Amino acid sequence: MPTTVTEFDTITAISTPPGEGAISIVRLSGDDSLAIIKRVYRGKDLDKVASHTINYGHIIDPKTDAVVDEVMVSVMRAPKTFTREDVIEINCHGGIVATNRILQLLMSYGARMAEPGEFTKRAFLNGRIDLTQAESVMDLIRAKTDRAMQVAVDQLDGSLTHLIKNLRQEILEVLAQVEVNIDYPEYDTDEMTTRILLEKAELVKGRIGELLQTAQQGKVLREGLATAIVGRPNVGKSSLLNHLLHEDKAIVTDVAGTTRDVLEEYVNVRGVPLKLVDTAGIHDTEDKVEKIGVERSRAAITKADLILLVLNQSEPLTIEDRELITATTDKKRIIILNKTDLPNQLDLDELQTLVRADEVIQTSILTSEGVTDLEAQIAKLFFGGIENSQSTVMITNARQIGLLNQAQQSLDEVISGIAAGMPVDLVQIDMTNCWDKLGEITGDSAPDELITELFSQFCLGK
């Protein structure tokens, strides 16, 4: 990967969300950044100001000398910038007209509209960050919980980079030793070379395995946990959704069948980002609209990572309750016995024959009784108490998981090849493949098409 790139043109983009707001930021990056901003800026001589300073002034239209906006201009000179290029950031008043007018002026004097993710891509190509750090930028932007934010910040600081580079160094050292032993066989025996390869393959495989064990938790932090709230009509599903959200998103009445569709909301439960789905009550109905809602509810159960199955403790179990218990047996689930504020009519002995005791939480959504226990159970079920852990090195996306699996497969080939008595130079190929796959994670050996695809997923101006 190059450590510096100088052939880029100068790019610009609005880095803040569109629409009305207190402040908008327009960003420039490239060799001509200072020259371009000087054409449209009236204030201090920016050639003479110190780097990493903010300067008051006005953006003007040079053709008419009309003031476009009152601004603060940040000047950041290469190489100590995010892109390792000269960077200018214009803080102007929020809004669509002024912000876009400034953008158009910059483009009219030589800047090009940046592609999505191009600022971060330049940071990567100029050696400022690697691919794991680039991905963590997007993870940080999209983080829905403090835990997800902390994992992203640690990866941006290089926690995963450091770990992967150490693994690659372990492999590189053994490959170098094998090369020496192959070139100078008089100083080595086949047994010694294969022993070195085997020990290193098993060591690196173990460390990759430890990383892969974090994949599910990392995926949950990054994408959210698809959680379906299910149950027959009027057992308290929508009340539970509203309680977790702390706002009234679902209609709550004592009329069965009020929720006729699937409602989705994100909520942070003790560091676990839940993508909550409040489903229509599952029951037999002749209403065409309700039937559609029921079918969508069944589909939501199939797709869900976690099921919150709500039962009404103030009524005996029904056929529909039993069907839902059976339908969710193979899913991660929590059985919520709601309405504990009312006299119990549910046969708990029968329930114990249908579900495990550790799946059951008793609640009254109306009085908030048991909701804290429910939240604790969700955190325990998926993070096993690690939500307070200081260790934040996690695999957070499918690309990283896939490459680690491929690297591990190459190590399996090394181990099986040695066991089968294969020549060292053939076994060495699989070890090199592992080294390459780990390099793709950080971008040291990633193909150009992958890099282009990855950065195209970023937002404009980042």
Curated annotation (Swiss-Prot):
Organism whose genome encodes this protein: Latilactobacillus sakei subsp. sakei (strain 23K)
Entry's cofactor comment: Binds 1 potassium ion per subunit.
Primary localisation category: cytoplasm
Role of this protein: Exhibits a very high intrinsic GTPase hydrolysis rate. Involved in the addition of a carboxymethylaminomethyl (cmnm) group at the wobble position (U34) of certain tRNAs, forming tRNA-cmnm(5)s(2)U34.
Any GO MF annotation of the entry: metal ion binding
Needed cofactors: K(+)
Cell compartment(s), UniProt: Cytoplasm
CDD domains xrefs: trmE, TrmE_N
Family statement drawn from the similarity comment of this UniProt entry: Belongs to the TRAFAC class TrmE-Era-EngA-EngB-Septin-like GTPase superfamily. TrmE GTPase family.
GO biological process: tRNA methylation; tRNA wobble uridine modification
Binding-site residues for K(+), renumbered to this chain: N234, T253, V255, T258
Binding site for (6S)-5-formyl-5,6,7,8-tetrahydrofolate: R27, E89, R128, K462
Name of protein: tRNA modification GTPase MnmE
GO cellular component terms listed in the entry, alphabetical order: cytosol
Binding site for GTP: 234-239, 253-259, 278-281
Keywords of this entry: Cytoplasm, GTP-binding, Hydrolase, Magnesium, Metal-binding, Nucleotide-binding, Potassium, tRNA processing
EC number(s) from the headed UniProt entry: 3.6.-.-
Pfam families: MMR_HSR1, MnmE_helical, TrmE_N
UniProt xrefs under InterPro entries: G_TrmE (IPR031168), GTP-bd (IPR006073), GTP-bd_TrmE_N (IPR018948), GTPase_MnmE (IPR004520), MnmE_dom2 (IPR027368), MnmE_helical (IPR025867), P-loop_NTPase (IPR027417), Small_GTP-bd (IPR005225)
Amino-acid positions noted as binding Mg(2+) in the UniProt annotation, renumbered to this chain: S238, T259
